[in-house]
Amino acid sequence: LKKLKDEGLLSGFEVRNLVVPNPVLPSFYCMPKTHKEGNKVRPVVANVNTPISKICDYLVKKFRTLKRPYSMSVKNSFETAERLAKETLTNEEVVVSFDVEALYPSVPVEEAYVLFSEWIDEQDISDVDAKLLVRLMRIVLDQRWLDYDGKVYRQKEGLFIGNAVSPILAEIFMGNIESKIKTSDWLPR
């Protein structure tokens, strides 16, 4: 953050607001998937009071002001229902939905970062703001350390479930795949 301040991308006030006093390592825990058969769990990395938690909050706040990455993405089930209500299907058509198993841990971090950078470049924001968002995302993605049972580990691949920026990165990554499918001859419309 000091380097971003020295480059004029952040003010001293902004740096102070992005620094977490007395931060802790993100901690790993599992949430049971009660809706699934067997003993399946969802691995979560708690990002509360960590070195990057305020940066993540800052980024998420900024993302809300930007255009959504892909027209096919939806905010919630209400928006899905609203969109489907506007569609008319023929008797030969069906609606399909896909669920990705372990989406966040399966997203390739560097590819998601490149796609994120491209998405930011398409936004109607200043070059300084764009550069800042991309650099802050790099800081977040480089922080891949976590605590589990008193030992420190580094997650090599995928996004953390529990990190506030993971949803937008996953949306950008999946949207890129959907966009490629939509522009191919794989789908009728």
Regions found by a protein language model. Name each.
Residues K2-E14, V60-P69, F116-D129, A164-V165:
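Short charge-dense sequence patches
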Residues K3-K5, P32-E37, I55-D57, L89-E93, ...:
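Short amphipathic alpha-helical segments, especially helix-boundary/capping motifs
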Residues L1-F28, E37:
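Non-catalytic, polymerase-adjacent accessory regions of viral genome-replication enzymes
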Residues L25-S71, E101-P105, R154-T183:
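Conserved pre-motif C helix in the palm subdomain of viral-like polymerases
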Residues E14, P21-F28, P32, V94, ...:
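Hydrophobic, conserved cores of late-appearing folded domains
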Residues S73-V74, E79-E82, K86-R189:
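Conserved polymerase palm-domain catalytic core
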